[in-house]
A protein has these predicted regions:
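Intrinsically disordered, low-complexity terminal segments enriched in Ser/Thr
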Residues: 2-8
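Short, hydrophobic/glycine-enriched beta-strand segments
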Residues: 14-23, 48-49
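Intrinsically disordered, low-complexity regulatory regions of eukaryotic regulatory proteins
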Residues: 8-10, 105
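Intrinsically disordered, low-complexity regions
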Residues: 193-195
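Acidic/glycine-enriched connector segments
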Residues: 25-188
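Glycine-rich short-loop/terminal segments
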Residues: 11-16, 28
């Protein structure tokens, strides 16, 4: 899980990483901080949400490092967390009810502008899985830190995702299948970057 490139390339200047994760995960271990440090070292742009949990913890870490190449995505005119006083991008949704679909509008836009994803997932959060799916559908690779066994997985295809999902309890896999119809999800792997 702890692999880094030794130098940046010119084409990395335009790399944007979508960072997200479960609201239940608010502590960053050495593995996650190492990956965040790789992002800083390579001067990647970061797009991140404003939720409590992983978003807030990662914002706190980047703020402590003085990292400025970050844009915080918020819904409508309300930004819940922006710990580094970074630029914000406010996303509008046609629905007013602040439910999963409301916040998924912001997630779709972040996935659209990203070139790569870094997700910190507890194996239960459907919002984090939705971010993974959004990125894979656009043939963008995703590094997933899977907190139950503290492992990292680089996903580039639906086959890669299927391997990771097998680590989730069957009750959660059934819930994901109902929510996202994963059995019909198919994406072939494309080349990507390393974090």
């Amino acid at each position: 899980c702890v692999r880094a490139r030794t130098h940046a390339h010119e084409d990395d200047l335009m790399t944007t990483v979508l960072i997200g994760g479960s609201r239940r995960l608010a502590l960053l271990n050495d593995i996650i901080r190492f990956r965040a440090d790789n992002i800083i070292r390579q001067h990647f742009a970061v797009v991140i949400g404003d939720a409590n949990g992983t978003d807030k913890a990662m914002q706190s870490y980047f703020a402590s490092k003085g990292y400025r190449n970050i844009t915080v995505y918020c819904m409508a005119d309300r930004c819940r967390n922006n710990l580094g006083d970074w630029p914000t991008r406010h996303i509008s949704a046609s629905r007013q009810k602040r439910d999963f679909a409301y916040y998924a509008t912001k997630d779709e836009e972040m996935a659209r502008v990203a070139s790569y994803g870094f997700m910190i997932w507890d194996g239960k959060s459907k919002g984090t899985l939705n971010n993974i799916l959004n990125l894979l559908k656009q043939q963008k690779k995703v590094l997933v830190y899977f907190s139950p066994d503290q492992s990292c997985h680089t996903l580039g295809s639906s086959d890669d995702l299927a391997v990771l999902l097998r680590k989730c309890p069957s009750i959660d896999r059934r819930k994901f299948e109902r929510e996202f119809t994963l059995s019909t999800f198919a994406v072939a792997e494309e080349p990507g970057i390393d974090l």
